[in-house]
Amino acid sequence: MSEKQVKYPWWYGGAAGIFAVMNTHPLDLTKVRLQAAPIPKPTIVQMLRSILKNEGIVGLYAGLSASLLRQCTYTTARFGMYDALKEHVIPRDKLTNMWYLLGASMVSGALGGLAGNFADLINIRMQNDSALPLDKRRNYKNAIDGMVKIYKAEGAKSLFLTGWKPNMVRGVLMTASQVVTYDMFKNFLVTKYNMDPKKNSTHLTSSLLAGFVATTVCSPADVIKTIVMNAHKKPGHNHDSSFKILMEAINKEGPSFMFRGWVPSFTRLAPFTMLIFFAMEQLKKYRVGMPKEEA
């Protein structure tokens, strides 16, 4: 399609992510709380009621600054790299080929996961902090305060590398299942059902389907990442490995633990995916931030 030949600004993904997360942060917070909750796990409704009762409306936005920082790093990196690879690496006649797109998305997701790992660490800890006993709370005031406190208490390695392996895996899975499936579903709807590629109905349908796929594919890595990053660490000690956490969880809960919190994950990721791609399409449509000659 002709729009793929246009060079869009690298920051479109991050800007769209900020728009999406501003509208879905309470759902993300609920998902994190449920993934970190002990057995027996509450339902999504019970968790929401508990947050509202104990923390009020403000509690639903705990860790928002870290979520925004995450969009500026993780989302900007993975979307920017994905578009760059499509523009400079993938042959023009292969832009709808699933295998080429998967390769580009995996590289982009891995780099995005690594780039945004520190922000994700702060985000998860801030979102789950109020659910911890008073003596275990970290009490980060905001994302910057969280960075400083982690650096002082645990060191730079902990700040940038805690949970990086499951986070990179999740980044690969998320980008492949979210971005590629969006492109594939959109192309399918346009070519098979003659839907208008510029209409919002096409964008929203494609993104809803992509959100379902992404939630299911990413759930195992997402759960492990949340557990690893939320764990307390003493100076001089390493976190348990992701593999050890995986084995312990399987022994305790069975394989179903990998889909713990699937419903709140989908409840959050479906609207997030719809909003981020809707925002991306609007940015592209109006050529925001582009020179007039390109618009």
From Swiss-Prot:
Principal place of residence: mitochondrion
Cited PROSITE patterns: SOLCAR (PS50920)
GO biological process, one term: phosphate ion transport
Repeat positions for Solcar: 4-88, 96-188, 198-286
Molecular function (Gene Ontology), one example: dicarboxylic acid transmembrane transporter activity
Keyword presence, Ribosomal protein: no
Compartments (UniProt record): Mitochondrion inner membrane
Topology class, membrane: Multi-pass membrane protein
One Pfam family matching this protein: Mito_carr
Keyword Amino-acid biosynthesis part of the UniProt annotation: no
Domain of life: Eukaryota
Record-annotated membrane-spanning stretches: 8-24, 63-82, 98-122, 163-182, 204-224, 262-280
GO CC, one annotated term: mitochondrial inner membrane
Keywords: Antiport, Membrane, Mitochondrion, Mitochondrion inner membrane, Phosphate transport, Repeat, Transmembrane, Transmembrane helix, Transport
Function: Mitochondrial dicarboxylic transporter catalyzing the exchange of dicarboxylic acids like malate and succinate for inorganic phosphate. Required for growth on ethanol and acetate.
Family classification: Belongs to the mitochondrial carrier (TC 2.A.29) family.
Record note on quaternary structure: Homodimer.
Protein name (record): Mitochondrial dicarboxylate transporter
Species of origin: Candida glabrata (strain ATCC 2001 / BCRC 20586 / JCM 3761 / NBRC 0622 / NRRL Y-65 / CBS 138)
Lineage: Eukaryota, Fungi, Dikarya, Ascomycota, Saccharomycotina
Gene: DIC1
